[in-house]
């Protein structure tokens, strides 16, 4: 699990419709598996569809590797439905060791609180990692900008700032001066309002700058803007460097891979214990001679191609969730 996968899962459960997208290798299939696992814990039904068989077979294979293949029904074409009916007794048999999956510890509220605490701690780590990446990227961009700025801009050496300011205030003042230079009043009210603003701005300039005229004209502000730009670049880089150093020290005390492994282990223990309570203790799984809605009580995860999914059950059969893998490859007719 990573930050983007975690956000995708939260979005999937927080919205009626959610889109998960990304290039190959970014964990979209793993995200589908995590969503399916959460639905199984909640005893919900889910239909997983795709425009091709290989995509849904990939999902089934990954669930089987986790020992969860007995929850799935791979349907679709007449051939696949026939194969399911004929092989379900063997290929979809409930694991013989399922009773050993049960753990009384997972029934306690404390165990769920532990999982929640682990998830929140991991979320904090992910947020720090992302903020660190953004800060490094911003710092690199500012360094490049400053290099070009210093090569192309002349700064009046006789003008200085009286005191240090945070970058946010420098940027605000920079924009304010730039707007004052470019502002063109239109009408009597605008001219009156601008006269008041100009009076107040000149008072601020006298407090903030040394070596600058105490009675400047509007065009004189152009001499101040390069100084503010340079100060902004310097101060913002100092702020980012300090933030990067702070986050790196925070992350150095955390073992993210170990935290992910611990959360995954505890989550799987909880899932398996719930499955043991549902399918263990001598549970007799019926053998289905036909594909009917009752099948969903035993096989809450149904997989099919998009084109064939409508033919699996009666039209009135409802699933709690539908996951469409590789949705961009599905035509609007079959997707509907």
Regions found by a protein language model. Give the residues of each.
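The Walker A (P-loop) glycine that initiates the GxxxxGKT/S ATP-binding motif of P-loop NTPases
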Residues: 22, 77, 326
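Conserved helicase NTPase catalytic core signature
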Residues: 1, 171-318
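Phosphate-binding P-loop
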Residues: 9-17, 38-41
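Walker A/P-loop
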Residues: 15-35
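P-loop NTPase motor core
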Residues: 45, 53-144
């Amino acid at each position: 699990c990573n930050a983007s996968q975690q956000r995708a899962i939260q979005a999937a459960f927080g919205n009626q419709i959610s889109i998960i997208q990304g290039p190959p290798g970014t964990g979209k299939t793993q995200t589908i598996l995590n969503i399916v696992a959460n639905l199984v814990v909640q005893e919900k039904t889910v239909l997983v569809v795709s425009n091709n068989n290989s995509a849904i077979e990939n999902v089934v294979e990954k669930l089987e590797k986790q020992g969860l293949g007995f929850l799935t029904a791979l349907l679709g074409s007449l051939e696949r439905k026939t194969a399911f009916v004929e092989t379900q007794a063997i290929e979809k048999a409930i694991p013989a060791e399922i009773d050993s999956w049960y753990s009384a510890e997972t029934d306690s509220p404390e165990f769920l609180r532990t999982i929640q605490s682990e998830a929140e701690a991991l979320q904090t780590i992910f947020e720090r990692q992302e903020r660190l990446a953004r800060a490094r990227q911003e710092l690199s961009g500012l360094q490049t900008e400053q290099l070009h700025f210093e090569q192309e801009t002349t700064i009046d050496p006789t003008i200085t700032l009286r005191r240090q300011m945070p970058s946010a205030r420098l940027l605000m003042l920079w924009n304010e001066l730039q707007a004052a230079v470019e502002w063109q009043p239109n009408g009597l009210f605008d001219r009156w309002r601008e006269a008041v603003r100009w009076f107040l701005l000149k008072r601020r300039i006298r407090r903030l700058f040394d070596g600058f005229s105490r009675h400047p004209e509007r065009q004189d502000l152009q001499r101040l803007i390069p100084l503010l730009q340079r100060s902004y670049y310097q101060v913002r880089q100092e702020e980012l460097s300090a933030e990067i150093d702070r986050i790196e020290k925070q992350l150095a005390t955390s073992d993210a891979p170990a935290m992910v492994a611990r959360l995954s282990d505890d989550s799987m223990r909880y899932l398996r214990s719930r499955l043991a309570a549902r399918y263990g203790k001598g549970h007799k799984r019926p053998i289905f001679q036909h594909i009917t809605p009752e099948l969903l009580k035993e096989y809450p995860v149904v997989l099919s191609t998009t084109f064939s999914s409508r033919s699996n059950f009666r039209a009135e059969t409802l699933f709690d969730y539908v996951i469409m893998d590789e949705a961009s490859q599905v035509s609007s007719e079959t997707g509907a």
